Every structure is written in C-alpha cells, then in structure tokens.
Design a protein with these regions (language model features):
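His/acidic metal-ligating clusters that form di-metal
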Residues: 1-78, 95
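Metal-dependent phosphoesterase/phosphodiesterase active-site architecture
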Residues: 1-11, 61-224
C-alpha cells in the first residue's frame, strides 16, 4: 500500500500537481500499528509541499491533529482534518463540513461545520441543520494553515462539546477533567503509542493488545 501511495505522490510531484489525501483511520487510533503510522508520517513529511489537505474519519468525532515531521518533532508537516459523520449515533449529532480552499494553492483556508439538531428535527418532523462553528473563528486563526493553532486551541468545555458534535446527551462529561485530558492527548498524538503514553495508561490489556498487533505485522526496515 505504501509503495503504491509513494508512487502516486511522486508522480504528482513530478507533474507539479497538488493533492488531497483521504484515508479512513486517523494516525493516533489503535487500528494503526506503530510502524504503519510512522511510515505514513514519513510520507506526509516528504510530500508536504504538494499535500493541500489531509482528511480522515472513523472516530465520528469532530477533531483535528497536527502531524509532526518525523525528523523534527518541533515542526509540523500537515494538519489532519478528522470529520464527524452523518451517522445518527446515539451520542453524536449528525454532521457535515464545507471546506473553503485557495484556488491557486488548493490549501484549506477554512471550513464551516454543520450539525443536525436531532431533538428539534424529531419534534418538527423535518431536518433542522445549523452552523456549529466556523473553524478560523473557533481556533482563532486567520486561516487553517496557521500551525500556531496548537498553542491557540483552548481545550475546555467548549472544545470538548465540539469534539462530541454538540450532542446534549454528553453534557455531564464535557467538564470532566478526565475527558478533557483525553481530548488533549488525541489533539497532540501522532500514533497510538504516543496516545497511551499521554493518557498515562497502565500497561494493561489495551497496551498489550496493541503490542501484540504490532508484533504480528512485518516491521518497517529502518533504512527504507
């Protein structure tokens, strides 16, 4: 898979093209083995100049993460936009995003996050969509290419509520410090190992399951 992706990225680079990269599972989740996450991270660093947007899903949560460069963890290569879904989960309101991109560079400049208020929709028997927030205003940046976003983001009640797609069913947990800390860790983690370390998870079942999964897959040779 990575050989194919590298060929596609290399071909786009030679042609002077800009690309949008879409995958399903964000880097920090347990479904990515460590070597898989690192190899993708290296490709994101190498081809960051042609990647105008990197988009994921899977979690059904409203998130973003900044992907650090593999060779310099003080610099960032791309922003990973993790979009909530239209699925009517019991603890997430259905959502969709409208991205605004620069016509020349194709880089994402901003996006508008829409929600479906299920309570009002069920009362009135018609969909009631509303704008939850505009990203540049929410993150207090001029555009979404401002990597200072990580220092400007205030992980608090408002941020956690946004992460869980505004649903009132989760209201009690939005001020829970454990939940706030978990969301902070997801915001700052580029692989599942980092997430577990950030969460200070005891080396129990979750840790060893991920360890076993990593052992089952072929390691990525360090000289590649």
């Amino acid at each position: 898979m990575f050989n194919w992706l590298e060929k596609v990225l290399n071909s786009a680079e030679k042609k002077g093209e800009k690309i949008y990269l879409l995958d399903h599972i964000p880097l920090y989740t347990s479904q990515h083995t460590y070597d898989c996450a690192i190899r993708l991270k290296v490709l994101l660093e190498r081809y960051q100049h042609i990647i105008s947007g990197y988009f994921s899903g899977h979690t059904h949560m409203d998130e973003l993460t900044l992907v650090e460069e593999y060779h310099n963890d003080k610099k960032y290569s791309v922003i990973n936009y993790i979009c909530p879904s239209l699925t009517t989960y019991s603890d997430f309101w259905p959502s969709y995003r409208v991205y605004n991109a620069d016509l020349k560079t194709k880089f994402v400049k901003d996006y508008t996050q829409w929600r479906l208020n299920l309570d009002e929709t069920n009362k009135n028997d018609k969909p009631l969509w509303y704008i939850s927030y505009k990203a540049s205003q929410f993150y207090n940046v001029s555009d979404m290419n401002d990597y200072d976003i990580i220092s400007k983001a205030n992980i608090d009640y408002k941020y956690v509520k946004k992460t869980y797609a505004d649903t009132p069913d989760n209201e009690l947990m939005y001020n829970d410090q454990r939940v706030i800390n978990r969301v902070k860790c997801e915001f700052n983690s580029n692989n599942y190992k980092e997430l577990l370390e950030c969460k200070n998870v005891d080396k129990g079942g979750e840790y060893y399951l991920h360890y076993v999964l990593n052992m089952l897959f072929k390691k990525w040779p360090k000289n590649e």
